[in-house]
Amino acid sequence: MATINQLVRKPRAKKVEKSNVPALEACPQKRGVCTRVYTTTPKKPNSALRKVCRVRLTNGFEVTSYIGGEGHNLQEHSVILIRGGRVKDLPGVRYHTVRGALDCSGVKDRKQSRSKYGVKRPKA
């Protein structure tokens, strides 16, 4: 335990909190251009072909972003919006593509959790 005199001379150092999404630079979303759209396999014990894309952001960062939902229309040079949120079984993927924003379409025939996949309310 430090004495009061020691604390007067040298105050306690503040702990620096490390961000999980450094490329966003404290913004809720960032815009970027797809440089590569591909599939990758998850860690054990899962098995699938996860859709991901490499994105060059407006601030110069190049990150990998996960494309959620069934089917997508992304290709190279598509302009997309990314948000934070990692994918637990894909190492190095710390961002999600926002569906239904910019060049990324919403998920076709989606009925539930529509707001997360950029789908408008169906007509009655």
UniProtKB/Swiss-Prot annotation:
GO molecular function, one term: tRNA binding
GO cellular component: small ribosomal subunit
UniProt key word Methyltransferase: no
Database matches in Gene3D superfamilies: Nucleic acid-binding proteins
Listed GO biological process terms: translation
Modified residues (3-methylthioaspartic acid): 89
InterPro entries named in the record: NA-bd_OB-fold, Ribosomal_uS12, Ribosomal_uS12_bac
SUPFAM superfamilies the UniProt entry points to: Nucleic acid-binding proteins
Protein's UniProt keywords contain Transcription regulation: no
UniProt entry keywords in alphabetical sequence: Methylation, Ribonucleoprotein, Ribosomal protein, RNA-binding, rRNA-binding, tRNA-binding
Domain of life: Bacteria
HAMAP family: Ribosomal_uS12_B
Subunit comment: Part of the 30S ribosomal subunit. Contacts proteins S8 and S17. May interact with IF1 in the 30S initiation complex.
Function comment: With S4 and S5 plays an important role in translational accuracy.
Family the entry assigns: Belongs to the universal ribosomal protein uS12 family.
Protein name as catalogued: Small ribosomal subunit protein uS12
Species whose genome carries this gene: Edwardsiella ictaluri (strain 93-146)
